[in-house]
Amino acid sequence: MSVNRILVINPGSTSTKIGVFDNERPVLEETIRHDTGEIKKYKRIIDQYEFRKETILEILHSHGINISKLSAVCGRGGLLRPIEGGTYTVNEAMLEDLKNGYSGHHASNLGGILAYEIASGLNIPAFIVDPVVVDEMEPIARISGIAGMERKSIFHALNQKAVARKVAAEIGHKYEDLNLIIAHMGGGITVGAHKNGKVIDVNNGLNGEGPFSPERAGTVPVGQLIEMCFSGNYYRDEMMKKIVGQGGLVSLIGTNDAIKVENMVEKGDPEATLIYKAMAYQVAKEIGGASAVLHGKIDAIVLTGGLAYSKILINEIKERVNWIADVIVHPGEDELQALAEGALRVLREEEAPKEYVVREKETVARG
């Protein structure tokens, strides 16, 4: 079997994780931590790409990695327009949307840009895989009770899809032939209904929908939320932080450290026990809803993400949902591996690369 050497890049706000893979085998994995003073020199996140590129190349050189031997470069997908899942070739339309922050400005936008900048000099392809904007929801799932306010698909697409493929292989099937419910449980929690390789419904784990998590509020009573918004006591940014960043366990018990909360539970703390069980309860409830989406025809329920290491949480969820289908636990997440595997499927011609296409923009005549 021929060896494809792939460089993968996963940019974060103050670090860049890189990996070099020979097919599925990791040759190098490293987290580059950037000096905050250096980061602050740049007004826009997107302006950091040259600095990060040079740092990546220096690290590769220091480890004796000959970049001329690379077959492809794959970056984490950023905040693009809604697209279906898969591996995409980085093209000009994608670069423009990443640089302009079409759906928002985030460090992940640098992934495709860095991949392209390094790959173009080597005349090899640059890819992204399953960004958070993956949207395969069915029309019926988009409807909310307010006209003009559609439900959005924003979830842990990269890890959910990667784990779904692993589980499919473990049980001897193709991902595209299965119905799965995948619950990714980390700083945010998303539960996706996977039908024949498409995530046809999923909670928006970023903007206040679904189970609460270590630092996100999830679904909350809307009437009370509106009253709080217009109480005159909070600015908009403060309210957004209550939803994302300072919600969930942070709001309820004062920490986003699930290990700390679990230790409190083991010591018999009644408040911590109730709150931790409530988080498991809400995850189980979301899984139950996803089972209805799939008409009760589910091949497996999969629990993944960092919180899947918690035996207390897993057992609480299992007790409530194991009547629906077998529960498989895949703790943690490996985004570098998932990116490498996405690129590898294309290099091996197991699937075709997808093209990022922007529909022609409407023009407005001005007198």
UniProtKB/Swiss-Prot annotation:
For this chain, one GO molecular function annotation is:
acetate kinase activity
SUPFAM superfamilies, per database record: Actin-like ATPase domain
Biological process (GO) annotations held by this record are: acetate metabolic process
What EC number(s) does the entry state?
A: 2.7.2.7
Q: Which UniProt keywords apply?
A: ATP-binding, Cytoplasm, Kinase, Nucleotide-binding, Transferase
What's this protein's family per the entry? Belongs to the acetokinase family.
Quickly give the catalysed reaction.
Answer: butanoate + ATP = butanoyl phosphate + ADP
| Compartment annotation | Cytoplasm
One GO cellular component, as annotated:
cytoplasm
Q: Which EC class is the enzyme in?
A: transferase
Q: Tell me the protein's name.
A: Probable butyrate kinase
